[in-house]
């Protein structure tokens, strides 16, 4: 999957009101940081009240990602989520806690659900075992991106994936991510994080179609 990452196009602060985004944008909304990025097509991202957002996409969009969360993130946050994840098993999509750090430059995902493609299959990656958090098992894989887009321009960097097994289903979903458990396990495998940049609970789609309406807290 081609992974984003948000490029600053416009940064605004919003009051309690719905706003539909058609173009790449980052900012703050009702106490939450948000990011919306796409590389093409008609995907839209709707800012709702509080930590709620909605995403709607079709196959006209090659790759998109959007979500709400925090900037900067941290290593000890417990993230709660609920709502509707409207894809099917044939759609290439992730529902995940997603973020970046610098020094080292790391892109990380805690994948709660996904469609047709699991990041555990990333080419050239290394399996880093599994652990239990919140009553669920997460399999961990480190992947490598070379000369790829990042939050500091085109770079080469590692990606860390914790993938929930079994994954959450489609339709109505809810759960929580104790991020500290992931950070501690990654560190035990020699996978450190750096200084946190943004950290969002995101929906991502790649050459697929779907709808998501998610509330983050």
UniProtKB/Swiss-Prot annotation:
- Please tell me where this protein is predominantly located: secreted
Record-level GO BP terms: digestion; xylan catabolic process
Instruction: Give the EC number(s) under which this enzyme is classified.
Output: 3.2.1.8
Tell me the Gene3D superfamilies matching this sequence.
2.60.120.180
SUPFAM superfamilies to which the protein is assigned, alphabetical: Concanavalin A-like lectins/glucanases
Swiss-Prot/TrEMBL catalytic activity: Endohydrolysis of (1->4)-beta-D-xylosidic linkages in xylans
Database matches in PANTHER family? ENDO-1,4-BETA-XYLANASE A-RELATED
Protein name, entry field: Endo-1,4-beta-xylanase
* Native source organism of the sequence: Phaedon cochleariae
């Amino acid at each position: 999957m081609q992974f984003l990452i948000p490029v600053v196009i416009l940064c605004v602060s919003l009051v309690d009101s719905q706003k539909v985004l058609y173009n790449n944008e980052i900012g703050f909304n009702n106490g939450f940081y948000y990011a919306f990025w796409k590389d093409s097509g008609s995907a839209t991202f709707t800012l709702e009240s509080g930590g709620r957002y909605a995403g709607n996409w079709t196959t006209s969009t090659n790759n998109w990602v959007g979500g709400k969360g925090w900037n900067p993130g941290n290593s000890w946050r417990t993230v709660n989520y609920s709502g509707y994840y409207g894809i099917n098993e044939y759609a290439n999509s992730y529902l995940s806690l997603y973020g970046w750090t610098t020094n080292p430059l790391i892109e990380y995902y805690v994948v709660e659900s996904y469609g047709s493609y699991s990041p555990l299959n990333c080419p050239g990656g290394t399996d880093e075992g599994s652990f239990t958090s919140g009553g669920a098992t997460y399999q961990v894989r480190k992947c490598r991106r070379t000369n790829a887009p990042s939050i500091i321009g085109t770079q080469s960097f590692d990606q860390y994936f914790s993938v929930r097994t079994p994954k959450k289903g489609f339709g109505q979903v809810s759960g929580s991510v104790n991020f500290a458990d992931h950070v501690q396990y990654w560190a035990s495998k020699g996978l450190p994080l750096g200084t946190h940049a943004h950290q969002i609970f995101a929906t991502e789609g790649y050459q697929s179609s779907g709808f998501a309406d998610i509330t983050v807290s």
